[in-house]
C-alpha cells in the first residue's frame, strides 16, 4: 500500500465552544480532512458566523524518541549550561552583595522586580505552549462548505474548536502514513509473530486438506524411494544375463506397489471439510505436491534433485496499521480491492487456540463495502489490496477487532484469525 492511501472514512461533529481532539487515543491512526460543512441549525439566537479553529502545541511533533540519537550532544550541552549557570550565580551573588551595601530598601525593590519578571515569564511560557489557528469561517448567508487538505498524525496534539453560533462537521479519511509505524517496528512484530504463532495440525487440515507433517513425510519417503532407483542402475549393469521378461515383471510389480502406497496416503489425507469447501481457501503447497506426483519420470538414470525451498515455503507477510498481519497464500488476478469497493468473500474465522467461531464456505458469499464501517476495522484493512481469486490469512489483534466486548463464541480481548478468499469485486 502506498503512503497516504485512504483506508476508512473519518467524520467529526463540532459543537460551538467545545474543544474536541482530532485523533482519539484508542485509535491512533493518521487522518486527512478534506471538507468542512456548516450545520444550518444554530445553537443560539445570535446567528453569528462560525469559525473553525485548530489548537495545537508547537513542540508536539518532537517526541522523546527524536532525541535518543543525540544523547552525547545533549550531555555536552548540559555541561555547558551548568557552567553558564554557575557563572550567572556568581555574578548574581556579587550584585546582591553590592546592593546590600547600598541599603536594605534597594534590595527589597530588586527582589520585587525579579519576582514580577518571573511571573511574566511563566505567563509567556503558558501562552507559547498552545497555538491557535483559524482554518475557515462559514455562514449560512455566504458559504456553507469549505474544501480542505489537512493531514494530522497521532504524534500531534491537535484539538478542533468552533466559535460562533453554528456547529461544523468535518469529513475526510483515515490514511496510512509513514509516521504511524517505523520499519523497525514491522520487523520486530514479524519476528514475534514467527516465534509465537504456531499452527496446529487441525487448522492445517481445514485449510489445506492435510497436515503439514504428512507433507514432510511424503517428501522424505519420495527421497527414500529415489535411492533404490540408483541402486537398480548398478544392479542392471551387473546382471546382464537377466531375461527381458523377468525385468518387465519386476518393474510392473514395483509400479503396482507404489500405486497402492500412494492410494493409502491419499485416503489418510482426505478431510470431509475440504470436500464441502469447494470455493473456500485452498492450499497451494498441496496442489504443487500432487502435480509432482502426477508427473512420470522419463528416465530412471536421472538422479533426483533435492529442493530445500519446497519443504518450507514461506508466504509474504505484511504488518498493517494497528498491528494487523496479512499473509498472502495465493495472489489473485485483475483489479485490487480499494476503499468504497463492494467485495464478496469466503472466510473461516478462528480464535488463537484454533477454535472456529464463524465461517462462510458455501451458499451466498459474504458481501460488504470496504472503508464504510460495515465490519471490524481489522477486517477492512485485511481485505484491502486483494484481487479476485486471491487467498489471504489475516491476523487481527483485539484492539482492531471486538476489543473488550465479548460475543457468543468470542471472549473479550480475543485475537482473531481469518482465512479469506476473494470471489467477487465490484
UniProtKB/Swiss-Prot annotation:
Regions of compositional bias (Acidic residues) in chain numbering: 65-94, 111-131, 181-225
Top EC class, one word: isomerase
Entry keyword annotation includes Signal: no
Subcellular localization, as worded in the UniProt entry: Nucleus, Nucleolus
GO cellular component labels: chromatin; nucleolus
One Pfam family recorded for the sequence: NPL
Location of the PPIase FKBP-type domain: 340-426
Segments of this protein annotated with the region Disordered: 37-143, 171-314
Keywords recorded for this protein, A-Z: Isomerase, Nucleus, Rotamase
Documented EC number(s): 5.2.1.8
Reaction equation(s) it catalyzes: [protein]-peptidylproline (omega=180) = [protein]-peptidylproline (omega=0)
Record's function text: PPIases accelerate the folding of proteins. It catalyzes the cis-trans isomerization of proline imidic peptide bonds in oligopeptides.
Protein name: FK506-binding protein 3
Source organism of this protein record: Candida albicans (strain SC5314 / ATCC MYA-2876) (Yeast)
Amino acid at each position: 500500500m502506498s503512503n497516504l492511501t485512504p483506508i476508512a472514512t473519518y467524520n467529526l461533529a463540532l459543537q460551538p465552544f467545545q474543544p474536541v481532539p482530532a485523533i482519539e487515543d484508542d485509535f491512533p491512526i493518521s487522518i486527512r480532512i478534506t471538507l468542512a460543512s456548516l450545520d444550518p441549525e444554530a445553537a443560539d439566537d445570535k446567528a453569528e458566523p462560525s469559525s473553525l479553529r485548530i489548537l495545537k502545541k508547537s513542540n508536539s511533533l518532537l517526541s522523546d524518541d527524536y532525541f535518543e540519537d543525540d544523547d552525547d550532544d545533549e550531555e555536552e550541552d548540559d555541561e555547558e549550561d551548568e557552567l553558564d549557570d554557575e557563572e550567572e550565580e556568581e555574578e548574581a551573588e556579587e550584585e546582591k552583595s553590592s546592593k546590600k551595601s547600598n541599603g536594605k530598601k534597594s534590595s527589597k525593590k530588586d527582589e520585587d522586580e525579579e519576582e514580577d519578571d518571573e511571573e511574566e515569564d511563566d505567563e509567556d511560557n503558558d501562552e507559547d505552549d498552545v497555538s491557535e489557528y483559524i482554518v475557515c469561517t462559514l455562514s449560512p448567508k455566504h458559504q456553507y462548505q469549505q474544501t480542505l487538505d489537512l493531514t494530522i498524525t497521532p504524534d500531534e496534539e491537535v484539538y478542533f474548536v468552533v466559535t460562533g453560533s453554528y456547529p461544523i462537521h468535518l469529513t475526510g479519511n483515515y490514511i496510512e502514513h509513514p509516521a504511524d509505524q517505523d520499519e523497525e517496528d514491522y520487523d520486530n512484530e514479524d519476528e514475534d509473530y514467527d516465534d509465537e504463532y504456531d499452527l496446529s495440525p487441525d487448522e492445517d487440515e481445514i485449510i489445506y486438506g492435510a497436515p503439514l507433517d504428512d507433507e514432510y513425510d511424503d517428501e522424505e519417503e519420495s527421497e527414500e524411494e529415489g535411492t533404490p532407483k540408483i541402486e537398480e542402475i548398478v544392479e542392471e549393469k551387473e546382471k546382464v544375463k537377466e531375461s527381458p521378461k523377468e525385468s518387465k515383471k519386476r518393474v510392473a510389480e514395483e509400479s503396482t506397489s507404489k500405486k497402492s502406497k500412494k492410494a493409502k496416503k491419499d485416503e489418510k489425507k482426505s478431510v470431509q471439510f475440504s470436500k464441502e469447501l469447494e470455493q473456500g481457501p485452498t492450499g497451494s503447497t498441496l496442489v504443487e505436491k500432487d502435480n509432482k506426483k502426477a508427473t512420470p519420470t522419463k528416465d530412471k538414470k536421472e538422479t533426483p534433485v533435492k529442493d530445500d525451498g519446497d519443504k518450507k515455503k514461506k508466504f509474504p507477510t505484511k504488518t498493517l496499521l494497528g498491528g494487523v498481519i496479512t499473509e498472502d497464500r495465493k495472489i489473485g488476478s485483475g483489479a485490487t480491492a480499494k476503499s468504497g469497493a463492494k467485495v464478496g468473500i469466503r472466510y473461516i474465522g478462528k480464535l488463537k487456540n484454533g477454535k472456529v467461531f464463524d465461517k462462510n464456505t458455501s451458499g451466498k458469499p459474504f458481501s460488504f463495502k470496504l472503508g464504510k464501517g460495515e465490519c471490524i476495522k481489522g477486517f477492512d484493512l485485511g481485505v484491502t489490496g486483494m484481487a479476485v481469486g486471491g487467498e489471504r490469512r489475516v491476523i487481527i489483534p483485539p484492539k482492531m477487532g471486538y476489543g473488550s466486548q465479548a460475543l457468543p463464541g468470542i471472549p473479550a480481548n480475543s485475537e482473531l484469525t481469518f482465512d479469506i478468499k476473494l470471489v467477487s469485486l465490484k
